[in-house]
Curated annotation (Swiss-Prot):
Annotated localization: Cytoplasm
Organism of provenance: Vibrio vulnificus (strain CMCP6)
Signal peptide: none
Catalysis: reaction(s): guanosine(1516) in 16S rRNA + S-adenosyl-L-methionine = N(2)-methylguanosine(1516) in 16S rRNA + S-adenosyl-L-homocysteine + H(+)
Main localization category: cytoplasm
Coiled coil: none
Protein name, entry field: Ribosomal RNA small subunit methyltransferase J
Gene this chain is encoded by: rsmJ
Any Pfam family the entry gives: SAM_MT
Function in brief: Specifically methylates the guanosine in position 1516 of 16S rRNA.
Cited Gene3D superfamilies: Vaccinia Virus protein VP39, YhiQ-like domain
Transmembrane segments: none
Superkingdom in the source lineage: Bacteria
EC assignment: 2.1.1.242
Length: 259
């Protein structure tokens, strides 16, 4: 993928080169997007809209830390959808990891979570945030133990893993495909900013419907699909049950009991 690759200090250039090599990113001086390496973190900036600010992954502080401490624990909707309220601590594969927030919530509640993110820029941001989180005094130990990242297209990865005899299938496959956002629907400023940048960088997940069948083949217990409250069922398939919040819905497709 091509975008501007920028170092804030020349001493960081070898690290940026390594990131570019790992995620197959090449420099394009004409791109409106820039991946910027600072001494603190890796950031994505939209250069033609500087007021949007930088997008980066911070699992140790900010809104993510607040949700971990005060978000409702196993009583929150995502935990119920994943089956944690049944007394289980399932293994999870997050097939659309994005910036890792939902995966982090599940990991903070005890789940081992493998993350798949097919966009290399988003994966690079997530990898950087994960690396920093693993060094954090408060959360580093369990993040290292419970969270891992696999860079691949979900469609390819889910089908390939389901047919891999060596791979231990997860209890739960979690999907949160990007969905076109109507202008009349309110979002927090942060989410709105991220969605705007990501949709112009990545585009909406127009092929998201193709995720459900391989996800059902891979999950041993259930597939959880996060949808906006106004969205139709993924691939038009009615879920076994749905858990609704003010703005979202978790559609649950049950393969087997959690017990």
């Amino acid at each position: 993928m091509q975008l501007q690759l920028i170092c804030e200090d020349a001493a960081l250039q070898p690290y940026l080169d390594a990131i570019a090599s790992k995620w197959q990113l090449t420099h394009d001086a004409d791109s409106h997007f820039a991946l910027v390496l600072t001494f603190e973190r890796l950031e994505l900036r939209k250069l033609d809209e500087p007021k949007l600010g930088a997008i980066y992954v911070d699992l140790a502080g900010g809104a993510v830390a607040h949700r971990r401490k005060f978000g409702g624990g196993k009583g929150q909707a995502i935990a119920k959808a994943a089956g944690l309220n049944k007394g289980a601590t399932p293994t999870v594969l997050d097939g659309t990891a994005g910036l890792g927030r939902d995966a982090f919530v599940l990991a903070s509640l005890g789940c081992k979570v493998q993350m798949v993110e097919r966009n290399p820029v988003v994966a690079a941001l997530l990898d950087d945030g994960l690396t920093r989180a693993k060094k954090d005094d408060e959360i580093g130990a369990w993040v290292s133990e419970r969270m891992s990242l696999l860079h691949a297209s979900s469609h390819d990865a889910l089908a390939a893993l389901a047919s891999d005899a060596e791979f231990v299938r997860p209890d739960v496959v979690y999907l949160d495909p990007m969905y076109p956002h109507p202008e009349n629907k309110k979002k927090t400023a942060l989410v709105k900013k991220e969605m705007r940048v990501f949709q112009s960088l990545v585009g909406a997940d127009t092929d998201a419907d193709a995720l459900l069948t391989p996800a059902l083949a891979l999950a041993t217990k259930r597939v959880v699909v996060k949808r906006p409250d106004y969205a139709e069922w993924l691939d038009g398939v009615k879920p076994s049950m749905a858990i609704e919040t003010k703005k979202n819905r978790f559609d649950v497709y049950v393969n087997a009991s959690m017990s």
